[in-house]
């Protein structure tokens, strides 16, 4: 699948997911290449159809994109609930376990998700896998002592790599933390790994989102299809 085909599937999923946002809602808006198409469609509906809703974003770049369309964006602490959050995912399996954080927004994404009545992910078909872990698992760590955290990950066999930008500088999250990517190839026991990571001093959050999502909208060549989590 080339990039143009992949983008077409992402766009289709984003447009389908935008239908979930209705007048008067408080909607969580995620981060990433697929969410960009979602926000474009919500912006179109706002400007052309008069859709009025309030957004809570998981990154400053999503906030900037939404506000460019005139969409009202507020801080998460200014609302008492979020009706639905629509976000992307880097991988998701049949058990609705996922990896997120490829865009370095995992902490804000998880905060918004855990305060949402409904969580929906939008992905292209390449993101649906049998076992998560092929995509590097992002872990947000504070800069102080990050080298020691990386050494601990190395000792565990996690194959950690500090994420750098195109200029060779450390990627910083919106909270000014570092991102360490774990190259695990596959994760057979995600719950155990999640507990191990979050209990590591210096770790702020990890990109394992386990059985959190209610629905996954998959961009498919035959049209968007929906995976519904029966356990939610």
Curated annotation (Swiss-Prot):
Organism whose genome encodes this protein: Bifidobacterium longum subsp. infantis (strain ATCC 15697 / DSM 20088 / JCM 1222 / NCTC 11817 / S12)
A GO-annotated cellular component: cytosol
E.C. designation(s): 5.3.1.6
GO molecular function: ribose-5-phosphate isomerase activity
Subunit structure of this chain's protein: Homodimer.
Protein name: Ribose-5-phosphate isomerase A
Entry-linked Gene3D superfamilies: 3.30.70.260, 3.40.50.1360
Catalytic activity: aldehydo-D-ribose 5-phosphate = D-ribulose 5-phosphate
Keywords: Isomerase
Biochemical pathway: Carbohydrate degradation; pentose phosphate pathway; D-ribose 5-phosphate from D-ribulose 5-phosphate (non-oxidative stage): step 1/1
Broad EC category: isomerase
Taxonomic superkingdom: Bacteria
InterPro entries named in the record: NagB/RpiA_transferase-like, Ribose5P_isomerase_typA_subgr, Ribose5P_isomerase_type_A
Active site: 109
Function of the molecule: Catalyzes the reversible conversion of ribose-5-phosphate to ribulose 5-phosphate.
One Pfam family per UniProt: Rib_5-P_isom_A
GO biological process: D-ribose metabolic process; pentose-phosphate shunt, non-oxidative branch
PANTHER family: RIBOSE-5-PHOSPHATE ISOMERASE
Encoding gene, per UniProt annotation: rpiA
Binding positions (substrate): 31-34, 87-90, 100-103, 127
The family this protein is said to belong to: Belongs to the ribose 5-phosphate isomerase family.
């Amino acid at each position: 699948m080339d990039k143009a085909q992949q983008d077409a599937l992402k766009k289709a999923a984003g447009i389908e997911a935008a239908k979930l946002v209705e007048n008067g809602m408080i909607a969580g808006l995620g981060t990433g290449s697929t969410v960009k198409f979602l926000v474009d469609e919500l912006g179109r509906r706002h400007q052309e159809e008069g859709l009025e809703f309030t957004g809570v974003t998981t990154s400053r770049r999503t906030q900037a994109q939404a506000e460019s369309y005139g969409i009202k964006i507020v801080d998460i602490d200014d609302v008492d609930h979020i009706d639905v959050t629509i976000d992307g995912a880097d991988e998701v399996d049949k058990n609705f376990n996922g990896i997120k954080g490829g865009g370095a927004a995992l902490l804000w994404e998880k905060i918004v998700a855990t305060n949402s009545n409904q969580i929906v992910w939008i992905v292209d078909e390449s993101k649906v896998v049998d076992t998560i872990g092929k995509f590097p698992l992002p872990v947000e760590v504070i800069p102080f002592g990050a080298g020691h955290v990386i050494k601990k990950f190395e000792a565990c066999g996690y194959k950690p790599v500090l994420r750098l930008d195109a200029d060779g500088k450390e990627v910083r999250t919106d909270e000014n933390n570092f991102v360490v990517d774990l190259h695990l190839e596959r994760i057979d026991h995600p719950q155990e790994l999640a507990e191990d990571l979050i209990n590591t001093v210096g770790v702020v959050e990890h990109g394992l989102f386990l059985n959190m999502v209610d629905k996954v909208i998959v961009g498919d060549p035959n049209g968007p299809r929906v995976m519904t989590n029966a356990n939610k």
